[in-house]
Each structure stands twice: as structure tokens, then as C-alpha cells.
Amino acid sequence: MSNKKVQSPKEESIAKMLICKVHIGTKNLENKMKRYVYTRAKDGVHIINLAKTYEKLQLAARVIVAVSNPADVVVVSARPFGSRAVLKFAQYTGAQAIAGRWTPGMLTNQIIQKFIEPRLLIVTDPRTDAQSVKESAYANIPVIALCDSDSPLEHVDIAIPCNNKGKESIALMYWLLAQEVLYLKGSIPRSQAWDVMVDMFLWRDPEQFELKNLANEEAAPTAPHLADNQYATEAPYDDWNKKDDWNDNANEEWKNPITVDEW
């Protein structure tokens, strides 16, 4: 009989957070983020309390599920490391994803073509996504944000304390949030593990793909030798080296002039 202890969902999630360095904050500390900091390391980096991270993650998932239409939830990431994560989160939950630059006025200017009216906004970083957070305050839209130790909490309704600068941390947080949303909706039972891997939410550098493709092309086997092919045989050089007189093969009829009667 195995003595291995079965982890609870909370312990399992926190263990994954430790692996992906969700608890690693920054050396700077926002005053309102003090409640989420567990301690400060010797090098000055603040360590985030993952128990509070898990609690806020559960709260955020319940708020997302409370929105009747999933398309009314907009998830934003101006940070490149979060672009793939927000797209995958939107794919599995039915939300709208905006990866990259935020067009100013999307929540306030009804004239522009990209104007939207969501009921909930999720941002990857309230500092890099400050424009969308500011517009949501004008439109009275609640905001859920992944907040690091130095993140401003102005206009943020639910702050999920975590490392929002590492690509592994961002991918895991959106994966856990999407998993909890699917659990609450009943799309997958809690007794069953989600078959989607965290790697699907992980950002990948396009340059690495290009280098990998070049390496594969260089390592690819060359074309088979065409020695046995009939088209690869050498031409007979003896025939080309013969000196023939073209006039010798001409018949006598060619030398005679053509008469009018023959036409």
C-alpha cells in the first residue's frame, strides 16, 4: 500500500504555482499590495502569499461564471508573454480576447468601429493595461487583474496577487482560472483532471520556431543518388566528337533547282 499523501485541489494548485514561480514578486512594493505579501527575501524580492492567491483565484472564477453570456467577458494583455494565454483562455471559456495594443476609446468612444460594451474586464497587468483599466472606470465595468507586488490597484475590483511578468506564471494563472471556470460551469467534473496542458497557454517566441525550422532543414537527408536513373546516365561523347560533313548526306535531288511545274 502506497503511503503517498493525496493532495487537495488547493495544495495541488499551490504546488504548481511554486514550480512556475508565481510567488516571486518584485523589489518594489505598492502600499495596497502589502496584505498579499508573505515575506521579503534577503535580496529584497517580495514573496507573495500563495494561499491568498488561491482564494482570489476562486473568487474571480465565481465572478466570471456569474456573467450569463461568456462573450461579455473581455480578457486583455498588452504584455507579449500573456498574448497566447489570453487567447487560449478565451478559446476554452468563450470570452473575448484582445492581445497586443489596446485601441484607445474601445470602451468609451461609440463612434469607432472597435467599440465594445463588456460586463467584465480581465487584465494581465494593471500597469501595462492601464488604458483599458482607466476606460473601464469611466464605463462602470468591474476589473479583475493579475497584480504583482508593485502593481497599482486603482480601479481594480479583484486583484489576484501573482507574478505577472514571467511567461510560466502568466500561463499557469490563466490555465488555473480557465479550469476553475469550467469546473463551476459543470463542463468538466471536479473528479476528472482537465486534459489541456499548461503548455498550451505558454508563450512561444516566433524566432525560436524559425531557428528550429532552419535546423530541421539542415539536418534533413539529401535527395537519393540518381546513378541508377536512366536520365542520369552520361551522354556518349564519341558521337559528339565526330566531324561529319552535312553536304555528304545530301541527295542529288536537293542540288537540282525547283521548276515551276512542280509547284
Swiss-Prot record:
User: Mind telling me which GO cellular component terms the entry cites?
Assistant: cytosolic small ribosomal subunit
Protein name, please? Small ribosomal subunit protein uS2
Q: Where does the record place the region Disordered?
A: 237-263
Q: Which UniProt keywords apply?
A: Cytoplasm, Ribonucleoprotein, Ribosomal protein
Q: Where in the cell is it found?
A: Cytoplasm
Q: Does the keyword Ribosomal protein apply?
A: yes
- Please give the positions of the paired cysteines in each disulfide bond: none
InterPro entries in the cross-refs:
Ribosomal_uS2, Ribosomal_uS2_CS, Ribosomal_uS2_euk, Ribosomal_uS2_euk/arc, Ribosomal_uS2_flav_dom_sf
Report the family membership. Answer: Belongs to the universal ribosomal protein uS2 family.
Role: Required for the assembly and/or stability of the 40S ribosomal subunit. Required for the processing of the 20S rRNA-precursor to mature 18S rRNA in a late step of the maturation of 40S ribosomal subunits.
Query: Which terms does the UniProt entry file under GO BP?
Result: ribosomal small subunit assembly; translation
Q: What is the lineage of its organism?
A: Eukaryota, Sar, Alveolata, Apicomplexa, Aconoidasida
Could you tell me which Gene3D superfamilies the record lists for this protein? Glucose-6-phosphate isomerase like protein, domain 1
Give GO terms: molecular function aspect only.
structural constituent of ribosome
Q: Which domain of life is it from?
A: Eukaryota
Assembly and binders: Component of the small ribosomal subunit. Mature ribosomes consist of a small (40S) and a large (60S) subunit. The 40S subunit contains about 33 different proteins and 1 molecule of RNA (18S). The 60S subunit contains about 49 different proteins and 3 molecules of RNA (25S, 5.8S and 5S). Interacts with ribosomal protein S21.
